């Protein structure tokens, strides 16, 4: 039986691992604390938490739509209904647009796909070598592993750094600009506004989602996920760790200003920076 190592537990990594594990030995490694990649869910208490990565799924291709429909039937996913306020003047609102989310969190797809696969979290890949027909993998936690096959599903800039010695295809020499995102998660006193999300028309704050509206939990507080615009985050992401407090304050103040919700005491505030959040011009190449 051939051994496979999949780096990354996002939708891509989880799907590949799920297909391979039917006839092969498969292990997954991820530097994060849990599965999901850019569909991560930040749990704070029992069922309460924040979708602090991808906010929802809206499948466009026929293949992906069929995949999502199966998960909807299995109740792994559900439709996020409610009042979605559309304030952006550049993007046109699509009335047929459906927002699909995880039943318990947006990492539910990954959790479902890898439920029978051995996963190793807190494991960041640092170096790779190909020795005697085996991939030697050195991780930052001082572990070394060997596998017959290696599959990498992380962002292109990280992939390029690790694999440029091994991949001869011209695509590896290309330059690709990925956008950043700074996400702030807040817990406040309950407001009387029954809103699911805001899509803002602002240079700093792009989006706000009310986690309570996803009907995963009940409590006496409001949980909001705030996401910056890419333009603003691109300028600040390199020093977000040092400036978390200031960046969070800017986004929180913008939220109250733009939403019209009365400013109240912040009971919890978390900040997460996505250096490689998304890419507006992806390669046509889907895999290599």
Where does each model-flagged region fall?
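Conserved flavin/dinucleotide-binding core of flavoenzymes
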Residues: 34, 220-288
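Short beta-strand to alpha-helix junction loop
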Residues: 56-62, 81, 85, 89-114, ...
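A conserved short coil-to-beta-strand element within the FAD-binding core of flavoproteins
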Residues: 121-136
């Amino acid at each position: 039986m051939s051994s496979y190592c999949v780096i990354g537990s996002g939708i891509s990594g989880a799907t590949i691992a799920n297909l391979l594990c039917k006839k092969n030995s498969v292990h997954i490694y991820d530097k994060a604390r849990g599965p999901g990649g850019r569909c991560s869910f930040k749990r704070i208490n029992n069922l309460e938490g924040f979708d602090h990565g991808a906010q929802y799924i809206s499948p466009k291709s026929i293949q992906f739509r069929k995949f999502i429909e199966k998960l909807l039937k299995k109740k792994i996913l559900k439709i996020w209904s409610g009042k979605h306020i559309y304030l952006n003047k550049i993007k046109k609102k699509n009335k047929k647009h459906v927002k699909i989310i995880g039943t318990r969190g947006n990492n539910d797809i990954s959790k479902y796909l890898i439920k029978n696969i051995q996963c190793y979290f807190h494991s960041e890949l640092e170096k790779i070598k190909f020795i005697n027909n085996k991939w030697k993998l050195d991780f930052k936690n001082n572990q070394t592993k060997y596998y017959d096959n290696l599959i990498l599903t992380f962002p292109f800039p990280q992939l390029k750094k690790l694999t440029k010695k091994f991949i001869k295809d011209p695509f590896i020499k290309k330059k690709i600009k990925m956008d950043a995102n700074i996400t702030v998660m807040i817990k406040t006193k309950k407001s009387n506004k029954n809103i699911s999300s805001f899509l803002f028309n602002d240079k700093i704050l792009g989006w706000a989602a009310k986690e309570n509206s996803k009907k995963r939990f009940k409590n006496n507080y409001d949980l909001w996920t705030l996401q910056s615009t890419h333009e603003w985050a691109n300028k600040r992401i390199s020093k977000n760790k040092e400036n978390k407090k200031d960046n969070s304050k800017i986004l929180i103040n913008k939220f109250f200003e733009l939403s019209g919700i009365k400013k109240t005491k912040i009971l919890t505030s978390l900040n997460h920076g996505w250096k490689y959040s998304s890419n507006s011009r992806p390669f046509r190449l889907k895999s290599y």
